[in-house]
From Swiss-Prot:
ATP binds at residue 258. The lineage of its organism: Bacteria, Pseudomonadati, Rhodothermota, Rhodothermia, Rhodothermales. Monomer. Keywords: Aminoacyl-tRNA synthetase, ATP-binding, Cytoplasm, Ligase, Nucleotide-binding, Protein biosynthesis. Its EC number is 6.1.1.17. It comes from Salinibacter ruber (strain DSM 13855 / M31). The gene is gltX. A motif ('KMSKS' region) lies at residues 255-259. Residues 71-90 are annotated as: Disordered. Transmembrane segments: none annotated. This is Glutamate--tRNA ligase. One of its GO terms (cellular component) is cytosol.
Length: 488
């Protein structure tokens, strides 16, 4: 692709399952590169593998991109100059160019049965330049026999004819020049027996016809790239620029598999992060730094700031470990930047899912108290249930440290005072506590700490007066009496 050509990149997932977190990073890097260079970001659905097609997967992909704000310029829904954008709707293109490869002597028909292929795999390993002459294909059969078999409806595939003992050079924007020995490359199937193209053929045909300038994808596709380069050469096309992103590794160092992720509590699928209460901006911020370095110490970037700073030459080639604690740290900053109203709105579904009925005003009060103490929105509920229900137990270390022989009497006296107040707000509960402390000639802490334990079951949390006011008069008094009964 000429260096002065307009930048056009594509995110081309297969709808064989929900969108993986690694797929979102690929989409993000494509998006950032396109926006940085005033180019086009294309969504293309690569659904040629009908056997693995999963209903709903395409909807999940679109929903994940919409949730994270990665808006594409062209795609199956909005169309574009290069429509259609589902490969299952573009089959005529693939058959046309597969035939051209055959006519050019760069691909061939193969009629081998599954049994013959299995025998080949067991004896020789690969269908390639050293073994294809032993098989039933258009290289070993006469033209008449090939035509006859096709006319009779025999099953066949079309395979790429990989040259023997050559070196294929792949120029990668991240890794530099990568060389591949063709003796280690198999004769890839390009068209399957059901007539559907494989990823490899459909991929290069669509990238060419859609004028894709840069192919930015995961490292797992690097080993396939020499096959693609051979096809570009055979068809007389200039290949796009390639950039293969580093693997996302588990915290233990290996490739982040679904099993490892589940064991480590790392969500695998993008929409699971929404369910877990992560902010989409935080997730993108975290993923951007999972392979790319901005060249500064700064770690928090809005999407437009990432666009301004992003470049492929600052993307590393080595795998990067997924650090869930780091993601939570990033998310914490985004949660703290929310307005209290926005946090309450985001928390509302989690509150209701937990079965709590809370007014808007009270929920906003609670959110204001806990906002700087949580990392993800659901923790408004999960880490602070004492706002919504009486504690079932009392923190042992807190009781040992904060509850003494005077605590019960002081707490009951405080409960009596609270019983008589009309306005149950922060100022009132503080005034009553400090007046009682003066009356009893004790420090305020002698009442504050038992009150916190009684009302929340903990020795830590938001300011005690805000806590009491948010829990409410009736609940506070009830909890204080229950604590005295339980702790003596």
């Amino acid at each position: 692709m000429a260096s002065d050509a307009p930048v056009r990149v594509r995110f081309a997932p297969s709808p064989t399952g929900r969108l993986h977190i690694g797929g979102l990073r690929t989409a993000l890097y494509n998006y950032l590169f396109a926006r940085k260079h005033d180019g086009d970001f294309v969504l293309r659905i690569e659904d040629t593998d009908q056997a693995r097609y999963e209903p709903g997967a395409e909807d999940d992909i679109r929903e994940a991109l919409a949730w994270t704000g990665l808006e594409h310029d062209e795609g199956p829904e909005q169309g574009g100059d290069y429509a259609p954008y589902r490969q299952s709707e573009r089959s005529e293109h693939y058959h046309e160019y597969a035939q051209k490869l055959v006519e050019a002597g760069r691909a061939y028909y193969a009629f081998d049965t599954e049994e013959e292929l299995e025998e080949l795999r067991e004896e020789h390993g690969a269908y390639d330049g050293s073994t294809r002459r032993q098989m039933r294909n258009s290289l070993t059969l006469s033209d008449e026999k090939v035509e006859q078999r096709i006319d009779e409806g025999d099953d066949y595939v079309i395979r790429l004819k990989v040259p023997r003992q050559e070196s294929v050079q792949v120029e990668d924007e991240i890794r530099g020049t990568v060389s591949f020995d063709t003796s280690e490359i198999d004769d890839q199937v390009l068209v399957k027996s059901d007539g559907m193209p494989t990823y490899h053929l459909a991929n290069i045909v669509d990238d060419h016809l859609m004028n894709i300038s840069h192919v930015i994808r995961g490292e797992e596709w690097l080993s396939s790239t020499p096959k693609h380069v051979l096809m570009y050469d055979a068809l007389g096309w200039e290949p796009p620029a390639f950039a293969h992103l580093p693997l996302i590794l588990s915290p233990n160092g290996g490739k982040l598999s679904k099993r490892d992720a589940n064991e480590l509590g790392i969500p695998v699928y993008v929409m699971d992060y929404r369910e877990a209460g992560y902010e989409p901006e935080a997730l993108l911020n975290f993923l951007a730094l999972l392979g790319w370095s901005p060249g500064t110490e700064e770690e928090l970037f809005a999407l437009d700031e990432m666009v301004e700073t992003f470049s492929l030459d600052r993307v590393g080639a080595s795998g990067v470990q997924f650090d869930l604690d780091k993601l939570r740290w990033v998310n914490e900053h985004y949660v703290r930047a929310l307005s209290v109203d926005a946090l309450a709105e985001k928390a509302r579904p989690h509150v209701e899912a937990a079965g709590y009925d809370v007014s808007d005003d009270r929920l906003q009060t609670i959110c204001g108290l806990v906002q700087d103490r949580i990392q993800v929105v659901p923790e408004v509920v999960t880490d602070n249930r004492y706002f919504f229900e009486d504690p079932e137990a009392y923190e042992e270390a807190g009781v040992e440290k904060r509850w003494n022989e005077e605590s019960a009497d002081l707490l009951l006296a405080y409960a009596d005072r609270l019983e008589g107040v009309d306005a149950f707000d922060t100022d009132t509960v503080e005034t009553e506590l400090r007046d009682l402390a003066d009356e009893k000639d004790v420090g305020a802490g002698a009442i504050i700490h038992p009150s916190r334990l009684a009302v929340s079951g903990r020795s830590y949390g938001p300011g005690v007066f805000g806590l009491l006011a948010a829990v409410g008069k009736e609940a506070c008094i009830r909890r204080m009496h229950r604590a005295v009964e339980a702790l003596g």
